[in-house]
Amino acid sequence: MKKYRILPLLLIVCLLLTAAFPAFAANSTASTAEQSPEPTANAASDGVPQSTVQAQEGSYVLGSDAVKTALDEKLQANCVMLVDEDSGQYYYTRNIDAKAYPASLTKIMTLLLAVEAVERGDVHLDDTVTAYADCNADMVEGASNADIKVGETMTFEDFLYCAMISSANEACNVVAEYVCGSISAFVERMNTRAQELGCTGTHFANPHGLPKDDHYTTAHDLYRITKEALSHELFATICNTVKHTVPATNLSEERTLSNTNGLINPDSPMYRGYYYEYAKGVKTGHTDAAGYCLISTAEKDGVRLLCIVLGGKGTARANGTTDFGSFSDTLTAYRWVFSHYGWRAIVSASDLICEVPVRYGRDGDSVTVRPAQTVSAVLPAADSDGAPQFEQQVTIYSERDGKPLEAPIKAGDEVGELTVSYNGTVYGTVKLVAAVDVAVSKGAYIAGHVAAFFTNPIVLVILLAIVLALVGYVLWLVRRRKQIEAVRRPRRRAQMEAEEARRRALAHETLREFDRDPAGSRRR
């Protein structure tokens, strides 16, 4: 085959092989990248226990039967709800969907709407607001107030503190009027927001909670409202403020507001003797119809609780004081859970989980994996009977993706993840990492990758294309040669015939010359 015919074929082969290598490399890179995806967000930080429970709404903590047995006779209120603030799981519930009057717990929704209006920019904390003429119109004798006078001006922020920590009913009316233009419009917004939060047993008739037949809620709905409210930093700050000073106004001297919540304020003007160092916020409430009500949170050793008590009783003590059931029930619930529950490791970072096959290892064909960090959960005390057996679901990225794990591997390299669950509730997910290094066998690595290269589907397709190109090129050459031969054959025949005719003509001419010169012929 001539040189000029070989060059195009070699060029085609080189181009196809050049295209194959990047495709193979890209495929290998993708395989490596998929073995170590980004860490998930629900892994606990090192040394800091965090709840990672993915619980269905309405699920209970492990050991909740023991909580119920312990607290059923101790708690007196009509409705009680004790919840893990992080996971949303219940420790204890009593009549949480029963209709109840919220009293001043209503103000949680009032403050939530006001805070959301501030966050939207509809109103501002430093706005100057004047108490309008009818702000005391629907008050009853003995209702809590901050002695706000008609025509008195103060900042919108100060009105919020009056409403929340002093439980001032007239301040709620002023806030409602300022945010929505009228109390009726504000109340409509309260009910709309309750529906948005998933409340199904709630209807508000005013922004402060004084008794009305059509003003009611449930402990379950109040949990939904409070959970949303506490997610706003301004709300959390206000409801946990023990003292707040309102500067002198146009009608009043400087006044100091004192939080009614005796859990956080030992000098509460209403409920003394219940101070609890682990408590924060949220709101007290009381009317004759509602009984003594309290929503609060508490945190101890990383365990965070939210407690709702509705319909607590007031019981006379022997010393002439009154025991307020909303507070005593709350403290009983907190103390029992904190003494019987705590953070426990359910998977340790030192646990060896399983062996994962590895290709091209120099000293072995597998690697041991362990959790990247300890997985902890809030569980009953370690000495409780019947410690739960958690289920472990292991996902190895290479096995999931159908691509083998390959050496070299460094200790700490992410190779998968571990999900820990119990009865369908996920208690944590953590990355799995290599526990040791796995060095690579260079010979096996090279041989394996060469074999992998030539068995790669992309390479096989390209090689097939090269073979087909070669076959096609040979067929083209054969056909081309036949075409050329077909053109040349008639020409050669014509040339041969012409040559033969020329020879015949020459011979004929020679004979004629002899015929014209007989003498010459004779001389010869």
Located regions from the model:
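Sec-dependent N-terminal signal peptides of Gram-positive bacterial secreted proteins and lipoproteins
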Residues: 4-24, 465-474
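Positively charged, low-complexity intrinsically disordered regions
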Residues: 6, 36, 51, 363, ...
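Active-site-adjacent loops and short helices of periplasmic peptidoglycan-processing enzymes
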Residues: 26-220, 224-233
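Domain-terminus/edge residues, biased toward the C-terminal soluble/receptor-binding domains
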Residues: 199-200, 213-216, 220-465, 469-491
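Cytoplasmic C-terminal tails of single-pass
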Residues: 482-524
